[in-house]
């Protein structure tokens, strides 16, 4: 294979030609342009190189010809015309003269310039050497290099004393889907599920690959259940030597190896299925002339193993690397010393730079497009509210609550959920009442979820409870189902510097059972990127007096500390706290049987503050009640004459008493009273002290000494050893469930009631549950399906289930944790939302070729501009045309993270609220021949009204006038400073009695 063909082959790998079967994400776009990319690689690239050479060759020849003409005339003038032959050559007798030598050198350069085409092959080899250094086992891995010899690396360094750097530095980790979620597809009457199960390792088995692959489960690969539901089970693991031979995967990329394994798995599954009808459906030809099952197998394995990272500035990185490569490899010292004619290597360097920059433009266009999709503020897909009955009464009155109850008794979904969560069966209004007395009716604190009711019900509920209350003030918390980077990015404007305490327990970077997808070579690097990306955003929402806690174990503490030093500042490190882990799972015999190291009984909790001089936090430890008060000497060694006086017949000549005379005599009297009362009550001094309010001092004479009583201490200041409390618990059937006692200590010590607490790796929901019980506001973010609900032997569980039980104060699990300790009785109000994900954004790309742009940019259109122009009308970027009805804006969304995405109406108003950073006060909905939604909020001390309604381009002047008058009437009582309105409008700053600035929503949205 020649150098050009070798470079072509590399480019096909870089542009994912092997992914031509894939129809999701960026692959769909590359496949859309597959023919044009192929034409560029197969034809245009060589033409570009030849054109570049031709240009530089002509420039070089003209320069050399000019130099040759100058030296020829100089020879003729100095040595005479006889020095040159009629053909223009130098006669032999003049060759050793200084001028003759110069003539011969320039003539040789002139002759050599005619043969410059021979270095074209060398240029392709240079380009191959440059780009191949970033292509590794099927992945594009941009890492700083300073030589191809010995595969040497370099890192950016600015003279820091210590520098933490990792392979995926300056990149986003983007694998936002669940780790190996069920993959489901349908074919007529059958439903197939690909499910990943834990691999069972044989003792002493020898791994032949470091890479992991999807292989069929050894024990139960295929199961056909009811209704023709097929479950196909896979393991994700390394291969042993026998498997490498069986699958015939000794060489090739990881992608090609997985495809070979998929082919074998396809054959095996068909062998296992005896039902001919099902087999026929799975074998029918599908996309790209592949059988349906094989196509889905390739799609499943690709979705779970591709697209880990996006570089934050690929063009800058590769351009800098290309410049260095040219200087160090193309124009190296060895080349400059060895070559007689440097002109051709300068031409070679220019062509390498020119063509290299073309390839970089193409690669960075794709990378920057993905970066733009990743960084785009995501849409809120759905918004619901959960509010307990008592809060409806508090905020909207008992009459409205009775109206709500009439709807509740008809909402079968709500009634069923209450029964399943252990709240009891509700059939009539009396079942909702806790007690009646002369003061009125006290209702049970049952949580009402608006998802079980109509949109009209939700709108009326929000309007009624915000008539006399500000919504964000009375909301206790916010749950967001989303990958956490996207959630943090979305809410950043609203919650900037508002969070008092952040606690996270991110997935640990363990070995085979890591909680995230990673390239085997870059497990720790992947974990570092996950944390770095998210911690940088978290710093933006942390208040200036706030604290952040990150829990990890020995697998990651060596990464967490320097990473947090870099992001939050070394001066803001407060402490490293040790937290108890769960009990060892193995028995004592097994621990000693294969003992390789001593057991690890604690995790690390890293505590940082936003600013060193503004942190609040005092950690208190409760002392055991078994510790009693005691008597001790009242005399002190210090010598203050004013504290020497007679007590019960004893005086001092030196030294001093502890207290002044007034306090001491009162303490003597207090003890005398106790001695008088105790024979009647039978109380100990400890009990008497408790009953009288724990404020009394006691002093007595004991033989020839004076003593005072030291009451038992209930609390003491903590150090960084927190092994006195559990670190994990198992109350909600969640593997890594943090204990409520641990979170109570963290939250109570670093925040006050009403402060905001956040956990963006929410897990089982402990942080939000504890925050609610302690009277804090809270935000929780989690992307897993357990956000909603999952079934256990103890009844339904999940974050949403847990928070509903917390609001109720009881259920299948509650009261639990700290509920009894803080006397938690329930009640509350929170919002939960589902947010668009990066994968959803990719699904909503619509390409529309731009003829004008192609004409304008010519050959550069494909390399630099096609993605920008051809996707600008996609729904993910906000299509203004679709926004004419803001209540019907649709995106393709996969809410259940399985199967194909479905068109879903998204919550445009809530999305815009986040973009503005609006603190919501009031919400009301009106009908004036169309739906009008009015939102009143506040930002930077100004009241802002946001108005949404459908509109048409065909509105007449009368329509616009009526629209204006209606809006003015509805906004009169709010008197906002700024009004945002969507679509057409004739609103003016003279807004009734209260002038206001009028702004349009669409330009703000497009930012």
Enumerate the language-model features and the residues they cover.
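Short acidic, Gly/Ser-rich segments with clustered Asp/Glu that frequently serve as metal-coordination loops
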Residues: 484-487, 509
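Glycine-rich, acidic and aromatic/proline-enriched surface loops and short helix-turn segments
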Residues: 504-509, 715-727, 748, 763
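Short glycine/proline-rich turn/loop motifs
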Residues: 464-476, 514-519, 722-732
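Mobile active-site "lid"/loop adjacent to the S-adenosyl-L-methionine
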Residues: 500, 507-530, 534, 543-545, ...
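Conserved SAM-binding loop and adjacent beta-strand
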Residues: 730-742
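Conserved beta-strand signature within the Rossmann-like core of class I S-adenosyl-L-methionine
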Residues: 546-550
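Accessory, often C-terminal, charged low-complexity segments
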Residues: 1-459, 465, 471, 485, ...
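Conserved proline-anchored active-site loop of SAM-dependent methyltransferases
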Residues: 234, 497-513, 564, 757-771, ...
């Amino acid at each position: 294979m020649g150098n050009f063909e070798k470079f072509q082959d590399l480019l096909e790998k870089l542009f994912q030609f092997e992914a031509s079967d894939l129809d999701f994400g960026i692959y769909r776009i590359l496949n859309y342009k597959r023919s044009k990319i192929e034409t560029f690689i197969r034809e245009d690239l060589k033409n570009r190189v030849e054109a570049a050479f031709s240009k530089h060759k002509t420039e070089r020849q003209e320069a050399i010809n000019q130099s040759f003409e100058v030296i020829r005339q100089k020879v003729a003038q100095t040595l005479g015309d006889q020095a040159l032959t009629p053909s223009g050559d130098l006669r032999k007798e003049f060759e050793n003269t200084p001028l003759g030598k110069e003539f011969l050198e320039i003539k040789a350069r002139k002759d050599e310039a005619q043969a410059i085409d021979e270095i074209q092959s060398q240029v392709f080899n240079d380009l191959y050497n440059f780009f191949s250094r970033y292509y590794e086992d099927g992945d594009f891995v941009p890492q700083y290099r300073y030589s191809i010899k010995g595969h040497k690396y370099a890192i950016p360094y600015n003279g820091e004393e210590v520098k933490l750097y990792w392979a995926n530095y300056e990149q986003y980790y983007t694998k936002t889907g669940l780790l190996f979620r069920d993959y489901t597809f349908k074919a007529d009457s059958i439903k197939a599920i690909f499910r990943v199960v834990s691999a069972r390792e044989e003792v002493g088995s020898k791994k032949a690959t470091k890479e992991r692959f999807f292989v069929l489960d050894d024990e139960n690969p295929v199961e056909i259940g009811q209704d023709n539901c097929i479950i196909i089970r896979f393991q994700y693991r390394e291969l042993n030597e026998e498997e490498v031979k069986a699958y015939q995967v000794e060489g090739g990329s990881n992608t090609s190896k997985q495809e070979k394994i998929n082919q074998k798995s396809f054959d095996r599954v068909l062998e296992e299925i005896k039902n001919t009808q099902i087999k026929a459906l799975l074998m029918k030809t599908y996309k790209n002339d592949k059988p349906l099952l094989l196509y889905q197998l390739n799609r499943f394995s690709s979705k779970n193993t591709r697209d880990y990272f996006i570089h934050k500035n690929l063009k800058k990185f590769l351009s800098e690397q290309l410049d260095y490569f040219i200087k160090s490899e193309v124009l190296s010292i060895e080349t400059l010393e060895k070559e007689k004619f440097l002109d051709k290597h300068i031409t070679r360097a220019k062509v390498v730079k020119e063509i290299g920059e073309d390839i970089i433009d193409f690669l960075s266009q794709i990378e920057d497009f993905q970066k733009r999709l990743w960084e785009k503020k995501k849409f809120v897909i759905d918004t619901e509210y959960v509010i307990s009955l008592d809060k409806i009464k508090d905020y909207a009155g008992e009459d409205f609550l009775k109206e709500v109850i009439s709807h509740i008794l008809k909402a079968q979904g709500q009634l069923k959920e209450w029964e399943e969560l252990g709240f009891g069966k509700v059939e009539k209004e009396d079942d909702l009442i806790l007690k009646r007395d002369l003061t009125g009716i006290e209702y049970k604190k049952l949580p009402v979820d608006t998802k079980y009711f109509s949109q009209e019900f939700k709108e009326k509920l929000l309007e009624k409870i915000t008539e006399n209350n500000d919504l964000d003030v009375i909301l206790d918390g916010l749950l967001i189902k989303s990958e956490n980077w996207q959630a943090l990015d979305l809410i950043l404007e609203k919650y900037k510097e508002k969070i008092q305490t952040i606690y996270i327990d991110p997935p640990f970077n363990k070995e085979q059972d890591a909680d995230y997808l990673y390239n085997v070579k870059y497990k720790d690097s992947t974990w570092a990127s996950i944390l770095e990306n998210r911690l940088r955003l978290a710093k933006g929402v942390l208040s200036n007096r706030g604290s952040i806690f990150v829990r990890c174990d020995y697998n990651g503490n060596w990464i967490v500390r320097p990473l947090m030093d870099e992001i939050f500042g070394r001066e803001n490190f407060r402490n490293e706290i040790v937290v108890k882990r769960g009990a060892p799972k193995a028995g004592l015999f097994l621990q000693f049987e294969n003992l390789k190291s001593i057991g690890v009984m604690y995790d690390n909790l890293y505590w940082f503050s936003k600013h060193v001089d503004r942190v609040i936090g005092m950690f208190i430890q409760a002392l055991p009640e078994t510790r009693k008060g005691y008597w001790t000497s009242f005399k002190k060694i210090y010598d203050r004459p004013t504290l020497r006086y007679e007590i019960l017949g004893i005086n001092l000549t030196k030294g001093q008493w502890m207290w002044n005379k007034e306090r001491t005599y009162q303490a003597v009297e207090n003890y005398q009273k106790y001695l008088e009362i105790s024979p009647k009550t039978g109380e100990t001094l400890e009990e008497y002290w408790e009953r009288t309010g724990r404020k009394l001092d006691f002093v007595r004479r004991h033989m020839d000494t004076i003593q005072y009583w030291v009451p038992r201490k209930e609390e003491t200041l903590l150090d960084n050893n927190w092994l006195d409390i559990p670190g994990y618990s198992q109350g909600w059937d969640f593997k890594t469930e943090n204990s409520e006692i641990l979170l109570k200590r963290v939250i109570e010590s670093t925040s006050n009631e009403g402060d905001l607490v956040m956990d963006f790796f929410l897990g089982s929901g402990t942080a939000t549950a504890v925050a609610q019980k302690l009277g804090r506001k809270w935000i929780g973010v989690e992307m897993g399906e357990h956000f909603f609900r999952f079934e256990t032997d103890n009844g339904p569980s999940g974050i949403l289930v847990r928070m509903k039980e917390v609001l109720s104060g009881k259920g299948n699990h509650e009261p639990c944790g700290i509920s009894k300790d803080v006397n938690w009785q329930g009640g509350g109000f929170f919002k939960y939302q589902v947010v668009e994900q990066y994968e959803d954004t990719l699904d909503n790309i619509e390409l529309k070729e731009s003829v004008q742009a192609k004409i304008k940019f010519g050959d550069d259109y494909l390399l630099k501009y096609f993605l920008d122009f051809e996707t600008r009308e996609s729904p993910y970027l906000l299509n203004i045309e679709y926004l004419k009805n803001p209540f019907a804006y649709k995106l393709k969304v996969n809410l259940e993270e399985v199967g194909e995405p479905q068109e879903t109406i998204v919550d445009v108003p809530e999305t815009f609220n986040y973009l503005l950073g609006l603190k919501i006060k009031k919400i009301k909905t009106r009908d004036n021949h169309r739906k009008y939604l009015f939102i009143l909020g506040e930002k930077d001390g100004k009241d802002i009204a946001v108005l949404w309604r459908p509109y048409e381009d065909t509105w007449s002047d009368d329509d616009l006038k009526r629209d204006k008058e209606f809006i003015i009437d509805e906004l009169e009582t709010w008197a906002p400073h700024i009004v945002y309105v969507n679509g057409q409008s004739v609103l003016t700053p003279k807004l009734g009695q209260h002038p206001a600035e009028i702004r349009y929503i669409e330009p703000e949205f497009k930012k």
